[in-house]
């Protein structure tokens, strides 16, 4: 239905006035603005990139990665930093926990020489640094590790037994209100690593778990990823890593509630080769006959770990199988579930 001509003129005049005050593009007709594809940063995990629906975490948005201790939260975040740096991105790591392992980060592919790192003393200091570097327009990705460690100054300056109810939640709410628009304008991705706590006095229905820092982050985050350790990986009775499951519990840029499973190897991080084998077998791209795995006429190895070792050495072959997996799944298809049973014994 056509809009009245007088209304059109009034709206056009209002848009011109708004452009003068707030800059061009402050108010636009959606039909006049070309809808752009959402850019993404790979997570370093083939399965999680597919589960997120756009090939990774969206740029210019807030992401929350949470889970129990030693579930792979920081490992996943460091992989995202490494992928961002591979494409020329500038990254920062706000280490509120003062626990960044630089050697491990380097093993995961992070360019530690060019990684900006801050170890703030208080939550206010951390969030001020975050706002300043974001407003600079020169940063592509910021990781905050973790929300639980963003301790308000009043709590640090107070005595050990003092009660400071809701201080951290108010601090987070205030910071997120200020920074959300800036992140979008500067196309900067912000990742908050968060921990799980048990709700006090929880009875009846609903999950007894909650995340720290209040409710603001739950609302402002465009993507929330719940990552859990689900099994131990063993080879010759030696514990060599963990199997992790990541669930996209909130997604504003694609359908939510998709899941991905992957191996996190000690000292190496996410095993891309393990995912290639899992998805390859599921899609009949990689053949499994007994313990032997093969691709076309080439034997990959006897057992999953041997096949992973071969793919790690032969990058061209790994890339070829990865491409076939992506073509088979298709960019608009639902994520293919992983095998119901692992290819090798886990506990």
UniProtKB/Swiss-Prot annotation:
SMART domains, A to Z: AAA
Keyword presence, ATP-binding: yes
Binding site for ATP: 67-74
Domain of life per record: Bacteria
A GO BP entry: SOS response
Keywords, sorted A to Z: ATP-binding, Cytoplasm, DNA damage, DNA recombination, DNA repair, DNA-binding, Nucleotide-binding, SOS response
Entries under CDD domains matching the protein: RecA
Family: Belongs to the RecA family.
Classification via NCBIfam families: tigrfam_recA
HAMAP family on file: RecA
Function noted in UniProt: Can catalyze the hydrolysis of ATP in the presence of single-stranded DNA, the ATP-dependent uptake of single-stranded DNA by duplex DNA, and the ATP-dependent hybridization of homologous single-stranded DNAs. It interacts with LexA causing its activation and leading to its autocatalytic cleavage.
Protein name, as recorded: Protein RecA
């Amino acid at each position: 239905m056509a809009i009245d001509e007088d209304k059109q003129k009034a709206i056009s005049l209002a848009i011109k006035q708004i452009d003068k005050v707030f800059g061009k593009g402050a108010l636009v007709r959606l039909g006049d603005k070309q809808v752009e594809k959402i850019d993404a940063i790979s997570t370093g995990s083939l399965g999680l990139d597919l589960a997120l629906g756009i090939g990774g975490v969206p740029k210019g948005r807030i992401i929350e990665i949470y889970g129990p201790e030693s579930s792979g939260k920081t490992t996943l975040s460091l992989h995202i930093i490494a992928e961002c740096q591979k494409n020329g991105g500038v990254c920062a790591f706000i280490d509120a926990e003062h626990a960044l392992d630089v050697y491990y980060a380097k093993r995961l592919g992070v360019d530690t020489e060019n990684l900006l790192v801050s170890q703030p003393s208080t939550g206010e200091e951390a969030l001020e640094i975050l706002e300043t570097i974001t407003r600079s327009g020169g940063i592509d990705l910021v990781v905050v590790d973790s929300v639980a460690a963003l301790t308000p100054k009043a709590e640090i300056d107070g005595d050990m037994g003092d009660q400071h109810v809701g201080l951290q939640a108010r601090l987070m709410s205030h910071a997120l209100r200020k920074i959300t628009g800036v992140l979008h304008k500067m196309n900067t991705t912000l990742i908050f690593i968060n921990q799980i706590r048990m709700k006090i006095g929880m009875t009846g229905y609903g999950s007894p778990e909650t995340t720290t820092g209040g409710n603001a982050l739950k609302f402002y985050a465009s993507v929330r990823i719940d990552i859990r350790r689900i099994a131990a990986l063993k080879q010759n009775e030696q514990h060599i890593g963990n199997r992790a499951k990541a669930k996209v519990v909130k997604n504003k840029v694609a359908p939510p509630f998709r899941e991905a499973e992957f191996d996190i190897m000690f000292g190496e991080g996410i095993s891309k080769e393990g995912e290639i084998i899992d998805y390859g077998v599921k899609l009949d791209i990689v053949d499994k006959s007994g313990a032997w795995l093969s691709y076309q006429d080439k034997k990959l190895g006897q057992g999953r770990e041997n096949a992973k070792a071969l793919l790690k050495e032969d990058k061209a072959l790994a890339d070829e199988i990865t491409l076939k997996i992506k073509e088979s799944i298709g960019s608009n298809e639902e994520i293919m579930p992983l095998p119901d049973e692992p290819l090798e014994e886990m506990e």
